[in-house]
Amino acid sequence: MSVQSHKIKAFEILVLSIAIVSGCSEAEVGQRNTAQTEQQSIAVSKQEQSIESIVSSEELILSLTPKLKKLNKSLANLRLPDDVSRGLFSDLIEVSNRISPPADRIDLYQGFSCGNWGVNGLAETTSSPDLVLWEQLFSGIKYLNHGKFNFVRGSFANPERTEYQSLLGSSGSAVLASGQIMGWNAKVEAVWSRDLTGDQWKISKWKTKSLETTLGEEPIFVEVLDDALKDKMAWRLATSALHDQKTSGLYAGTQPERLEGDEYPFFFAETTLEHPSVAIVDIDSDGFDDIFVTMRHTQNLLLRNNQDGTFEECGVRYGLDKTGNCSAAIFGDFDNDGDPDLFLGRPRHRGQYFVNESGNFKDRTRELIGPDLPFMISSISTADYNGDGLLDIHLSTYGPLENVHHFTADKAPIWSQQYLTEEEQSAFAKELSETHVYLRRPGPANMLLVNTGDGAFDVARENEQVQLWRQSFQATWSDFDNDGDPDLYVANDYGSDNFLRNDFPNGFTDITEDSGIAIGFGMGVSWNDYNNDGLVDLYVSNMFSKAGQRITADVSKIDPRFKKLATGNYLYRGNGEKFELVSGTSLESMQVAQAGWAWGGQFVDFNNDGFSDIYSPNGYYTAPSDIAVDMDL
């Protein structure tokens, strides 16, 4: 990453920090009244000093992060440091590195156990050529699956800023010579030093703070796609990264921002609008699960289960080989005829409804759906919310963040004119007038469809109560209060989630504030009874950001809501009336918060022991290798 890129990043941090301190939106930053009292000027000066310190610290982390890749390669070589990474260390290093294998291990399940290594804090001084770290950890490893270091936090250790005290995290997975598998998590205090005239930072102190390893007899899951999908064309479609190809072409200048056709009036690499999804369905009622995959740029895939561990692509056979630009799908017997039908969400086109007619899916959107289905559908959920025995539909919608800077003269984003009706634009404009870019960012309206029988749908009379006008990633239903009807939880990005109690026939009541729900970048939600007490609990996917934790911790007078935005996923224990947040980073909390930048985490009982486990996908954006920069936070 270039110095210019560093400065751009620092400027973004500066703007965000000012916004956090002042509690204003981006539009309000810079509109401060210059006629301040002397006391206010002093306060502002201190704030500016604090912000400058934060920016300098974050810039240094940005510049040092690529150096950690050399340590990552050392892990792969099972030598820390190796000949390449040894240059990261000073000629003389103060080291606290005496570690010993766990004296006791805690049995987990199915042959897995974990244990903390003994760590001796005694400091020794050694020369760079003689430095050997974590030798005992590597001694039993046959080969490494993956391993990495990352910055957790850091700060300058002296006024001259020639020393930088950092906390590093390390994690990895390896196969041992014994055949067992091992994972580790470690924390290291590393001091980086430079002289007054130079900018070459080197590690002068290394202290292993903690090291935990998990052992298992074999992996819980093994990648078998190559064996399960024999058809080469289907395999290529399932594994190809066409979005990466388009991204590379765009940044190389071979493809325009506005691509041909109306499907992609704007194209951005870090898209949140077009995202693949997976739906499970027994398409042929043979008792085996089949897989439907929505695609961004090619036709969708229907992988039929051959009952022998393999799948065949048969979308054409069922009429489901539709062109991509799809983001969500859900199967259900919406006409009560005994076979699954399909609702399909499409971000840059209106949603579609396919009826299963003797094994052939027909688009019956115009005939059976009363209103126009919305654009920008991000996810779909189904429940019989009114207790009439028919499945109803909730559509979550999410406006394209990539177009947030494409504004029209009246300050509304272009997508609002392209994808909303005039009436919807008017309602959206009202939401814009009350917006906060981080805490209350508006989006398109969600939609509730009521099943009127024979597979037909109309707008529910409660629709206005659930529209919300937020950036809604996912909604899901569960009878939280045990009154016989399903309640609705909506995970919203850039704002508070919404928990809507179903009081049918008296509509929905928003009980978010009274239920104990915390603010977060909501990107998924799942219901289950994790502690088997007969009451449903809730797992909400949010964002855990090391950078966000660092910045919000160092800014004084911060709006407390901002601190919550980077604290990770939330596990709530339900009591039938309210939620209690039981997850967090403290030792007393359930350790399910630090799941990275999480998307759609789900409860599932992986080991069939009767207790719900959690799977939480995470990540944000990985650039194609041909255009990627040497940076990853």
Residue ranges and their predicted role:
Residues S2-E12:
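Bacterial N-terminal signal peptides that target proteins for export
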